[in-house]
Amino acid sequence: MKRSEINTAIDNALRALERHDVKLPAYAYWTPDDWKRAGPEYSRITRNALGWACTDFGQGKFREIGITMFDVRNGNVDRPEEGTPYGEKIFVLQPGQRLPYHFHWKKTEDIISYHGGTLMIQLFNANPDETMNETTPGHVYCDGVRREFTAGQVFEIPHGSSLTITPKLYHRFWAKEGGDVLVGGEISTISVPKTDNRFGGNARRFVPIEEDEPKRHLLNIDYPQLHETV
């Protein structure tokens, strides 16, 4: 991805959040210079990779396949004494923008619709070899209510509602085409994106960044560079 795409995506996300009166922690609005001035009391934020994330999953077409997220809370599997025993994200999707098919080996998550556009979620079971099973039915829970699904079924999630994704359940979600920008969220067990994503095809969570313009916002993957030029 280009840094210019990331800057614009976060600017757009902040506008969408402001429009729906969704507030984030103060450091969500910091500049790189603000981060340079941050003291050691902020080290838990950087260690646990809280803050902004933005990816096109290596597909090179962010407007179609991508997401902008802010990790509000998370724990640390290597340091169980700190952080929280759960994760929370706020995400923003443009109309028609989607994530690629993927599952998690360990994480259970509620995907929640909050404001704006309509959240759409598609589900498939996984085969024992971790490929997608395109024939078998299954079941999930929406706000605690059991729902059966056929392979590839799409659920439309109204505002205030959620769908629970369990391990090894292939899913992708998006903001319904022709609608508004979607503000959604995720509440989950501790999130470990570096090791707990299994994507279909050639998609990947972390992608190289082309620094075509200065950073306006730091991503959580930028934190190791805080003592370098940002």
Predicted ranges, named:
Residues 94-95, 107-109, 113-129, 134:
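Glycine- and acidic-residue-biased ligand/ion/polar-headgroup-sensing regions
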Residues 1-87, 216-222:
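A short, N-terminal "cap"/entry segment at the start of jelly-roll beta-barrel domains
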Residues 78-87, 98-110, 114-115:
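A short beta-loop-beta micro-motif enriched in histidine and acidic residues
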Residues 89-91, 109-113, 120, 154-155, ...:
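His/acidic/aromatic-lined binding-pocket segments of jelly-roll/cupin-type domains
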Residues 2, 128-148, 174-230:
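Double-stranded beta-helix
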Residues 94, 151-178, 184-189:
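Conserved metal-binding segment of the jelly-roll/cupin
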